Amino acid sequence: MPKTKSLLNGIGNQKETERYYDDWATNYDETLKNWNYKAPKKAVDILFNLKKNIIFNLDLACGTGLFGEELIKKNNMIIIDGCDISSQSLKITKKKNLYRNLFRQSFEKKIKLNHKYDSVSMIGSMTYCKKPNLLFPIIFNYLKKNGIFIFTHRVDLWIKQDFDSLIHSYNKLFKFNYKSRPLN
């Protein structure tokens, strides 16, 4: 694991976050397995309970592809594109051969795409979003009509950033239909 005081050091600082995950990439999957981190699997289960016919998914901040692995287990015909700022994480993801396209960039910047997705995922990375209020309109542009955006967020930051109010302010853009209890 990188020699950084905490994951919070990366919040709002893209270069620091990129460096943090580049340094951690080779041990990331093993570390999260040791933490018994189940958010990717639980998020996939929730996603497929909400929408069964997912063909295309965009995985924002895909990291080493843990969410993509769970998607493929659920539906091996799904087509996944991903983006991440960590070049080292993307190298690991590419070796797993799960994603059709991988983009090296921040999820806070719009990706130039020629198509829309049935679902967009952002699992374990909302922590690093500097301006979540600007992210939702970007996400909306990636989704097909009736598409699903699934994300996880830390409980402490959900409260601090008043995410309930933020989500409520986008009710006209999105249909919010599920809020789970905290996941690990």
Roles of regions detected by a PLM:
Residues 146-154:
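Conserved beta-strand signature within the Rossmann-like core of class I S-adenosyl-L-methionine
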Residues 36-54:
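Conserved alpha-helix/loop element of class I SAM-dependent methyltransferases that forms part
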Residues 58-110:
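Class I SAM-dependent methyltransferase SAM/SAH-binding core
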Residues 161-182:
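Conserved Class I S-adenosyl-L-methionine
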Residues 119-132:
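A short SAM/SAH-binding and catalytic strip from SAM-dependent methyltransferases
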Residues 1-26:
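N-terminal, positively charged/glycine-rich alpha-helical extensions of SAM-dependent methyltransferases
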Residues 133-145:
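A short glycine-rich, Lys/Arg-flanked "PGG" loop and its adjoining helix->strand segment in the class I
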Residues 111-120:
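A short acidic, Gly/Pro-enriched loop at the edge of an enzyme's catalytic core
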